[in-house]
Amino acid sequence: MTREESIAFYKEHARWLFNISLRIVREPALAEEIMQDTILKALRQTHGPEGNRKLPERAWLAKTCIRASIDALRRIKRERLFLDEYASDGAPEYFSPADSDIPEERLSVNKIKAAIESLSDPYRLILNLILIEGLDYEEISSITGEREGTLRTQYSRARKMLAARLMAGQEGL
């Protein structure tokens, strides 16, 4: 693969992979790192012993990016548990949620995003993968290792939680 082909591949997939990862990890720097690692992994596959391998399909790229993002979340969770357990009171707070809620008088995309972001990990993840990425239960099951029935239950609960949060926000207007 030539340098120009590699650059074209990067330009074609970078933003899409970044957005997938950002919706999961909610930290731009980490999402960018995951996106770059995913692209490097894809490009390395084309430079194997045969030298003329095809580039991976979008489904493979999405699956690889999602798995890397979930792994990063697990790593952050372990670090957070460690900090909570062993850090002193004077330690800096590394994991503060971003305050991105913009007050508006009607139900808006920003309010929906904020409501989704306020959900805990399994519910936020399932909503992002189904509603935003357009994946089905079978694809999500192969990515996360969860059973499809579990995913359906999580999705149903996530929708109810999201609706309740949006309704609570509407009543406050």
Question: What are these regions, as identified by a protein language model?
Answer:
Residues A29, E138, G149:
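Residues within helix-turn-helix
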Residues I126-I130:
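A short pre-motif secondary-structure segment
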Residues E79-E105, D136:
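Internal acidic/polar
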Residues A62-D84, E105, R157:
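Arg/Lys-rich amphipathic alpha helix in sigma70-family domain 2
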Residues N19, E33-L40, R44, L55-R67:
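Structural recognition of an alpha-helix C-terminal capping motif at a helix-to-coil junction
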Residues K111-S120:
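Short amphipathic alpha-helical boundary/capping segments
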Residues I66, I70, Y123, I143-A168:
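DNA-recognition helix of helix-turn-helix
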Residues M1-N19, A29-E32, L43:
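A short, charge-rich alpha-helical start-of-domain segment used by transcription regulators
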